[in-house]
Amino acid sequence: MTGACDELLGRVERLEARLERVESVQSIERLGQRYALAADARDIENLLLLFVDDVDCGRFGVGRDVLRSSYEVVHRQFYRTVHQVVGHTIAFVDADHATGTVLMRAEHEVADRWIVAMLCMFDTYERRGGEWFFVRRKPESWYVTDYGVPPHGPDWSPEGWDGRTPRLPHLFPTWATFWDGNAARAAELTDFPV
């Protein structure tokens, strides 16, 4: 009977380990998705919470407050952005550490142009307190280009095919907070701050 119990216990332990790995993969994949949405919503607070609290920002210092300064500067270079996660790979170092790549298409509105970039984010992840975080993100691009015909200009309307004005990115409560007091900068970046 002991042998059968040991075998059953071994199966349960292996099943638990597999389930743990699947849950970790899903949590790490959600990091990339949450990053894209937070960036597009200008939700800087939630963007920062995706990183370890002692994130190394290189020559600028350590910590989320240092990272905040960087993201606020970067995100004020564009008005609307759309980040699309198109693929994700994950390699586990051990149960609490992993590396990965996130393939991402990023679109940025800059004044009268829309810039599109095909990126690969090289990530390092760590689990702390049962939750996965970014330790590091290093973006690299295959290309960055201007759309041939930007989705605005003299013949463009902000109304969609159904006649409704798009609600994004203004639907995100953090969007208004981010741009509050910066209407002049927004006007430099877009003709249609819907």
Where are these regions (language model features)?
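Conserved aromatic-histidine-acidic binding/catalytic patches
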Residues: 20-23, 78, 113
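A hydrophobic membrane-anchoring alpha-helix module
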Residues: 153-194
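Short, low-complexity N-terminal intrinsically disordered segments enriched in polar/charged residues
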Residues: 1-37, 41, 49-50
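Short, surface-exposed coil-to-beta transition loops
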Residues: 83-85, 115-121
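A structural preference for long, well-packed, hydrophobic secondary-structure segments
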Residues: 25, 104-105, 114
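Short beta-strand edge/turn micro-motifs at domain boundaries
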Residues: 2-3, 97-99, 120-155, 161-166
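A solvent-exposed, acidic/Ser-Thr-rich amphipathic alpha-helical stretch
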Residues: 43-110
